[in-house]
Amino acid sequence: VALGACSPQPSEKKEPAPAAEGAGDPAASAATDTGADSADADNATAAAEQGLPATEGAQVNEWTSCPYLDSQWVADTNGQRLTTQGIDTRFDPPACVFWSYPDAPQITVIVRHMPSVEEARAVVDWAAPIDSTEPADFEGWTGGRGVFSDSSVYAVQKDDYAVAVWTNQQQTLKAELIAKEAISNLKL
């Protein structure tokens, strides 16, 4: 399955896009969380409505549960205990980031409602570059899946929606199951 909006890529193999920018240590990232008063919430909503670039990674700005994925289900699916989680409210619905014991996130989920089909495809091309991933598709959703040195990615697009999931496991099936659960729970 070819993605029509994917641009030609250099022949060198690329690693997937960063799952959660600056996500490293949840405690260190929490220093930037100011409690999100109503002005912060309004700004986050406005940014989501204005549209972030297709290449925008998740940056946790609120330490709370993911509104569309059950934390125990996520832990069971990825095969790792969940120690903390947070969301990035700049996205609508918010991006979800889950940690286990390592400093890096175990799972990052970004769901994008883009202004156009082409921009949704650009999200998938950024998350799962066509030259370093295999095709992925199900029920009208198309995109890519790939395994890298310390992670895997599953990213798909349908109409003007894109869903990208990164996991620290080297099995795309886990990322795929999480993406499908997010799609189902959000009724996309």
Predicted segment positions?
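Secreted/processed peptides and extracellular or luminal domains of membrane proteins
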Residues: 12-13, 71-72, 102
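A short, solvent-exposed beta-edge/loop patch
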Residues: 10, 25, 37-62, 134-188
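Sec-dependent bacterial lipoprotein signal peptides
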Residues: 1-4
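Amphipathic alpha-helical segments
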Residues: 65-81
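Sequence contexts marking disulfide-bonded cysteines in secreted/extracellular proteins
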Residues: 7, 65-67, 95-97
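Short, solvent-exposed recognition patches
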Residues: 76, 81-141
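Bacterial lipoprotein signal-peptidase II cleavage site
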Residues: 6-37
